[in-house]
Amino acid sequence: MQVPRVKLLMGSGAMFVFAIIYGWVIFPKILKFMISKQVTLKPGSDVRELWSNTPFPLHFYIYVFNVTNPDEVSEGAKPRLQEVGPFVFDEWKDKYDLEDDVVEDTVSFTMRNTFIFNPKESLPLTGEEEIILPHPIMLPGGISVQREKAAMMELVSKGLSIVFPNAKAFLKAKFMDLFFRGINVDCSSEEFSAKALCTVFYTGEVKQAKQVNQTHFLFSFMGQANHSDSGRFTVCRGVKNNKKLGKVVKFADEPEQDIWPDGECNNFVGTDSTVFAPGLKKEDGLWAFTPDLCRSLGAYYQHKSSYHGMPSMRYTLDLGDIRADEKLHCFCEDPEDLDTCPPKGTMNLAACVGGPLMASMPHFYLGDPKLVADVDGLNPNEKDHAVYIDFELMSGTPFQAAKRLQFNLDMEPVEGIEPMKNLPKLILPMFWVEEGVQLNKTYTNLVKYTLFLGLKINSVLRWSLITFSLVGLMFSAYLFYHKSDSLDINSILKDNNKVDDVASTKEPMPPANPMQSSTVHPVQLPNTLIPGTNPATNPATHLKMEHRERY
């Protein structure tokens, strides 16, 4: 078969160009287009079903800081903390009352989180352990009144002594009572000061309190948030513009917040954290709005990672240094006065939750060193306390993530309330939580066999084509070099076969300078056996000796 050198050159060159264009340009665009059509929140799509009703629970961990020297701290001593945890819960997420707006390409929904205690994963903890924490009503209430309504201090102090008789600055209670079942708030007194204090419970200003009858309430950190409305979102469906998939456009039916003194901090940036757009660039970061903080937070790319053998990108985030970052000054009480900004690595939640609470990373990780030095018992480190996400950019899939956040009391002495008048001024850690997810193989295989299998096939195909084209180009160069018009493949194969035949039948060549040799006639030896041997024949009968010339 004759292959003209010009055709061989053109064919090999065309194959090379096709491999480059198809493998690195056309195929990626086709794949991205297919993903963009599949990954939307359009009713009836698989992504919509997974997004609205997460078919598996997230892991929710609670770590509590037990104060081991409460009486000394009440007199101004340095707090000694003992971390107790994790108390493990299964967190189920679902969205209900979904309303689609086809024109705006949005969907509105109400988010609901349900926490179910996991006794097996919590062992040896049971949830009935007694914990000592700052009094969750007296301390935040007293500090808030001193800062904002000092004229009412005497009335509030008297009311607290009636509603919480003999109360101290620190409360000892079971974990489940503090966080879910609730501690009792008795508003049955007819005293004016007690009634005035209880007004904030009856009007719903204390969001963590649940009314059980006409005169009693139960207060807990998370009980009211369990299996209840946690906010109504409106997000983009991504049908018309896939890059906007999941983007929050409204929360509580408002296009922006009215919490912070500057408008920029009130904007919604990113998604609701349960879905992300595919095809993001790693330098864009992963942004999500967090209602608990009344703020959007962004995670930034750190390095490449892998999950179950699939490549991913590791993202991390922190709360930053509000004082040092001009773009974050709107989170200060007064953006013009930097002294009102919280310390590095913390965020003041007073405007968001209505109390003297501060958010931070667990153990004040990446925070001001003074925060760690003010208390005993903290050990900040990246492994246990950093926030991270392992994310696959092309499909927009988070493979695993750990969202960690610590809640602290911005504590100070309160002269008007006897149990609080000698408290030290510092930021006291109370507890921290971790919301984690690790996709199992059922869901990672969806990505593996729809995305990575296609990428692998494309990689094999393009490199195979490139290899064949390079071989063709080398043969073409050979023909042009030898000025041959064509390549006779049959002749080459025939010549190769001839070479193989000659190589297999060729006799071995004699030595260059052969020496004469003679066989010495065997000498008859006595038939004697050596103990331990049993030769079949006498070796001397096969002995050959070289005949050497004497000089």
Curated annotation (Swiss-Prot):
Glycans are attached at residues 66, 213, 226, 440. It comes from the Eukaryota. Keywords: Cell membrane, Disulfide bond, Glycoprotein, Membrane, Olfaction, Receptor, Sensory transduction, Transmembrane, Transmembrane helix. Pfam families: CD36. Residues 1-7, 481-551 are cytoplasmic. The keyword Flavoprotein does not apply. InterPro entries: CD36/SCARB1/SNMP1, CD36_fam. Residues 29-459 are extracellular. Disulfide bonds join 265-330, 294-352, 332-341. It is a multi-pass membrane protein. One of its GO terms (cellular component) is dendrite. Plays an olfactory role that is not restricted to pheromone sensitivity. Belongs to the CD36 family. This is Sensory neuron membrane protein 1. The lineage of its organism: Eukaryota, Metazoa, Ecdysozoa, Arthropoda, Hexapoda.
